[in-house]
Amino acid sequence: GKYTMDESSIAYMDGDKLFQRHAAIVGSTGSGKSFCVACVVEQMAKLKHSNAILFDIHGEYSSTDFKIDGIKQYKIATPGDLATSEKLNNNILMVPYWLLNYEEMQALLLDRSDQNAPNQAMIFSREVLAEKEKGVEGTIYEHLITVDSPVAYDLQTVLTRLKSKDEEMVPGARAGSEKLGPYNGKLTRFNQRLENKLSDKRMGFMFSLQTEEKSQNWLKDFARVLMKADGGVKVIDMSEVPSDVLPLVIGLLARIVFTVQQWSSMEHRHPIALLCDEAHLYVQQSISQDAVAEIGLKSFERIAKEGRKYGVGLVIISQRPSEVNRTVLSQCNNFISLRLTNVDDQNVIKRLLPDNLGNIADNLSLLDIAEAIIVGDATLLPSRVKINEPSIKPSSQTVPFWSIWGKDNSDQDLSEAICNMIKQSK
């Protein structure tokens, strides 16, 4: 971009320091935040071995403009994609249930208020581990895996065993008599929740697996798609993922990236950045009793604290920084702050900025569209900058209400919208 005080001077940021120390791009809706993200992505895409993942929550970075060299478009499978073969080759991503660790499966399936929850968690983990061990018999992984190991297994078989235990009768004290088994009736509600998940078409990307997603080799191909060194910027369209499991799904993807980096040898580790659009939806400050959001947050807290050691950079993008987790925000050493109109949001950013900025931070509500205050290790001095308009434009531009209302013909295809709403897919 260019400095607001001197438009003849070009403002630069140090790319190494920007991603090494994590960054935050914040701004109220309509402030030019999406343009700023597009500008960063455009510059990254020009690098020969750029490596980043952009979690696109609303599908605004999946427009035609973003289909250029250095940017690859993916989407989480919708109900209409489940029958597609070779999904990875068609840029369709499944997130199989067998990637979930013990805590994530509990958050998704277990009702903490159920008095039988401890028994349900114990027997479920035991059956899952038994099924995983069965799958690695005779391989190099035999006797080495845990319930958290990402090993493919058949969840339907686990459900069948749980149903059997829920109805089990065992020999009684008297000869020929029977009594209720130790888990009889205690797994009923858990089994019902699991059956509901398996039959929920919205969750098909996780539970409706074909043969290819049930193969152990699938994980290697999946990791290559997400993390290969010449992969460029991978935009993952998350717009059709159910909102109630969005934190879990994104947290799982982030955890996989971090874990693969952690287990890679240093000489073969290629740095990768995670760009978290609308981060306040899944890197939340206030979680209350939401187990799914809580477990998803853990991945980002760990990346914020330890990601630098393993070459994982984090870019938090949000219109409501006051709703973003403080632990994660406090680890960001670079801030690109566009106009913020909410007082709470302004105060959060002001508290995170250095004390010696003078009154520059007082201008957060006065900034023009696509104008930002940039502070941090990636810039020599705190600066007020007008961000260049990117050549690739997101589909989030402000809708011209008055102009559209004044047109002669502006019909909306409501039939198509209703059809998409019913089938939960565009």
Residues covered by each model-derived region:
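Conserved nucleotide-binding/hydrolysis micro-motifs of P-loop NTPases
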Residues: 58-62, 80-81, 240-242, 280-281, ...
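P-loop NTPase motor domains
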Residues: 59-64, 90, 94-299
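Conserved ATP-driven motor cores of ASCE-family P-loop NTPases powering translocation/secretion/packaging/pilus
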Residues: 301-306, 310-386
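Loop/turn-to-beta-strand initiation segments
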Residues: 49-53, 230-233, 269-273, 310-315
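Glycine-rich phosphate-binding loop of nucleotide-binding enzymes
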Residues: 1-81, 326, 374, 404-406
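Conserved P-loop NTPase motor module
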Residues: 369-426
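Conserved catalytic network of the ASCE P-loop NTPase/AAA+ motor domain
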Residues: 17-18, 43-48, 226-228, 263-268, ...
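Conserved AAA+ ATPase "SRH/arginine-finger" region at the nucleotide-binding site
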Residues: 75-80, 95, 99, 335-344
